[in-house]
Curated annotation (Swiss-Prot):
Keywords: Nucleus, Phosphoprotein, Repeat, WD repeat. GO terms for biological process: ribosomal small subunit biogenesis. It comes from Mus musculus. Scaffold component of the nucleolar structure. Required for localization of DDX21 and NCL to the granular compartment of the nucleolus. Part of the small subunit (SSU) processome, first precursor of the small eukaryotic ribosomal subunit. During the assembly of the SSU processome in the nucleolus, many ribosome biogenesis factors, an RNA chaperone and ribosomal proteins associate with the nascent pre-rRNA and work in concert to generate RNA folding, modifications, rearrangements and cleavage as well as targeted degradation of pre-ribosomal RNA by the RNA exosome. The modification Phosphoserine is found at residue 41. SUPFAM superfamilies: WD40 repeat-like. Residues 1-135, 547-622 are annotated as: Disordered. WD repeats lie at residues 192-233, 234-271, 314-353, 356-395, 398-435. This is WD repeat-containing protein 46. InterPro entries: BING4_C_dom, WD40/YVTN_repeat-like_dom_sf, WD40_repeat_dom_sf, WD40_rpt, WDR46/Utp7. SMART domains: BING4CT (SM01033), WD40 (SM00320). Part of the small subunit (SSU) processome, composed of more than 70 proteins and the RNA chaperone small nucleolar RNA (snoRNA) U3. Interacts with DDX21, NCL, NOP2 and EBNA1BP2. The keyword Heme does not apply. GO terms for cellular component: nucleolus; small-subunit processome.
Length: 622
């Protein structure tokens, strides 16, 4: 039996053969065809050979990001992203304009809703941080809105005449010939002399039109496609007609009571508590139908629950002039003594009264921003008032014939119906009042005007008169872009139903209607102080008052009576010094304000005597 020789001098030791590593199979898309591809092909990072070079020592102050033991979130980098560094795209090219698109400052300010000039000096740190976060969110929202405004492709148009041409002399036939076919189809006349005169109302989307004739004719139609929705005869006089929150419900003020119809002409409700109604207005965000009557009552009907919210006795006789302020939902009523009163369902007395004319008020209209109010009276005066707290007339014009109907467009155009003539005045823009010097457009109708309204989101003016209905083209009257989530003219039936549910959930209570809606978000300081005073009287002490200083007990004879009194006096002196320093700063600020010269004033040589007299406590007139 042979044995293996032992390793010795002549026999080399036996070694194990190294096993060849199995290569990972490569796919056809991972194959390397050229040396360049091999050099640039992605693969696992190669380990660098260690060299004898030592790494530079790390400074002790260097921050090392460590993973938290309590949170699974990765550590957040405190450094802001550097937008200035060029970013590389998928194609390998560098972006020449890195970062987000800069928003124009003017557009961002237009969308900002927070006034940063008002600060809370003595607010808590938690409250201050919440305010700062809200301001940052509001600023970000305004910047995004300014960037999104670039997507609004539609722009408002306007009618511009040739050199020396008066636009008031341009006829409707000339405008129809100059515009496209789709816009020309929006101008039409309805000859309905047998049932006139007519009142009219457009829906909030601007797609549907409701007509109500004095002799009982009621009709609703899609005026864009000329498709008739319903047509009935109520067999009694119709005084006014108005759509509710959607085109599916229609309110008709008939001779005796108020009726509600659907879009098929079926009578749904007869509201007998609203009798002898003369005018109708609907508040869309509150779901309130405001009615005025011959008996002098202003009634608010909640159409969501079918109940009367309030019935106010105006004590001014017959009410036939009413308008709504779209900004704050306040109702404006015109009276026979020349005054206009402002009403809210939360108050039984008028919020304000404005003396506008020497005679009775015939018509009232308020623009879409709630800034300007136009009135016309029996004295043939047309006036525009400023509603921003002053209620002062800005401009006035004497008309050859008193205007019986007024209306504002979405972009601030003012129309007045005088007999069978319609005059339109335009201003410098939406935020400026219309100029009453020269009319923008003029049109003569086949009958006396009985109702006026601009169509939302369309450059169209609807006029109801004794001969029927006329649709006029008014360039630059409406907003070119609409909010698809609020008023969408192209919405389907399902979208309308979804919008109704959301609108009912976001319904604003009637008690919140006031002149200044922004006051709802402010702090009621008077009520807060009154509650604090009542709390102090009830408890017998002020729980929020600062506690008296109580020195801590010390050892080794430092808590003697003299030491305690000395420490208390030191704290009292410090508080007294702070109060004196604060009062001196207030006096210096007041003195600077008193000595500040008005803009445009020149310094005088006698000003030095005025300063000395004020410092000495004397009263000297400059």
């Amino acid at each position: 039996m042979e044995t293996a020789p032992k390793p010795g001098r002549g026999v080399p030791p036996k070694r194990d053969k190294p096993q060849a590593k199995r290569k990972k199979p490569r796919r056809y898309w991972e194959e390397e065809t050229t040396p360049a591809a091999v050099a640039t092909s992605p693969g696992p990072p190669r380990k660098k050979a260690r060299t004898g070079e030592s790494r530079p020592p790390r400074s002790k102050s260097a921050h090392i990001a460590q993973k938290s033991r309590f949170s699974k979130k990765p550590p957040i980098s405190k450094t802001a992203p550097d937008w200035k560094k060029p970013q590389r795209t998928l194609s390998g090219a560098q972006d020449p304009f890195p970062g987000p698109v800069p928003a124009p400052l003017e557009e961002a300010r237009k969308f900002c809703r927070i006034d940063k000039s008002k600060t809370l000096p003595h607010s808590k740190p938690k409250t201050q941080s919440k305010l700062e976060k809200a301001e940052a969110q509001e600023e970000e929202a305004s910047v995004r809105a300014a960037r999104a405004e670039l997507l609004l492709a539609e722009e408002p148009g306007f009618l511009v005449g040739e050199d020396g041409e008066d636009t008031a002399k341009i006829l409707q036939t000339d405008i129809v010939e100059a515009v496209d076919i789709a816009s020309a189809a929006k101008h039409f006349d309805l000859n309905l002399r047998q049932f006139g005169p007519y009142r009219l109302n457009y829906s909030r989307t601007g797609r549907h039109l409701a007509l109500g004739g004095r002799r009982g004719h009621v009709a609703a139609l899609d005026w864009v496609t000329k498709k008739l929705m319903c047509e009935i005869n109520v067999m009694e006089a119709v005084r006014d007609i108005h759509f509710l929150h959607s085109e599916a419900l229609l309110a008709v003020a008939q001779n005796r009571w108020l009726y509600i119809y659907d879009n098929q002409g079926i009578e749904l409700h007869c509201i007998r508590r609203c009798d002898r109604v003369t005018r109708l207005e609907f508040l869309p965000f509150h779901f309130l139908l405001a009615t005025t009557s011959e008996t002098g009552f202003l009634t608010y009907l909640d159409v969501s629950v079918g109940k009367i919210v309030t019935a106010l006795n105006v004590r001014a006789g017959r009410l036939s002039v009413m308008a709504q302020n779209p900004y704050n939902a306040v109702i404006h009523l015109g009276h026979s003594n020349g005054t206009v009163s402002l009403w809210s369902p939360a108050v039984k007395e008028p919020l304000a009264k404005i003396l506008c004319h020497r005679g009775g008020v015939r018509a009232v209209a308020v623009d879409s921003t709630g800034t300007y109010m136009a009135t016309s009276g029996l004295d043939h005066q047309l006036k525009i008032f400023d509603l921003r707290g002053t209620f002062q007339p800005l401009s006035s014009r004497t008309l050859p014939q008193g205007a019986g109907h007024l209306a504002f467009s979405q972009r601030g155009l003012l129309v007045a119906g005088m007999g069978d003539v319609v005059n339109i005045w335009a201003g410098q823009g939406k935020a400026s009042p219309p100029s009453l010097e020269q009319p923008y457009l003029t049109h003569r109708l086949s009958g006396h005007v009985h109702g006026l309204q601009f169509c939302p989101f369309e450059d169209v003016l609807g006029v109801g008169h004794s001969g029927g209905f006329t649709s006029m083209l008014v360039p630059g009257a409406a907003e070119p872009n609409f909010d698809g989530l609020e008023n969408n003219p192209y919405r389907s039936r399902k979208q309308r139903q979804e919008w109704e549910v959301k609108a009912l959930l976001e319904k604003v209570p009637a008690e919140l209607i006031c002149l200044n809606p922004r006051a709802l978000a402010e702090v009621d300081v008077v009520t807060l102080e009154q509650q604090k005073k009542e709390r102090i009287e009830r408890l017998g002490y002020d729980p929020d008052a600062k506690a008296a200083f109580q020195p801590k007990a010390k050892q080794k004879g430092r808590s003697s009576t003299a030491s305690l009194v000395k420490r208390k006096k030191k704290v009292m002196d410090q508080e007294h010094r702070d109060k004196v320093r604060q009062s001196l700063e207030q006096q210096q600020q007041k003195k600077k304000q008193d000595m500040a010269m008005p803009p445009g004033a020149r310094p005088s040589a006698l000003d030095r005597f005025v300063r000395r007299a004020r410092e000495g406590g004397l009263q000297v007139d400059p």
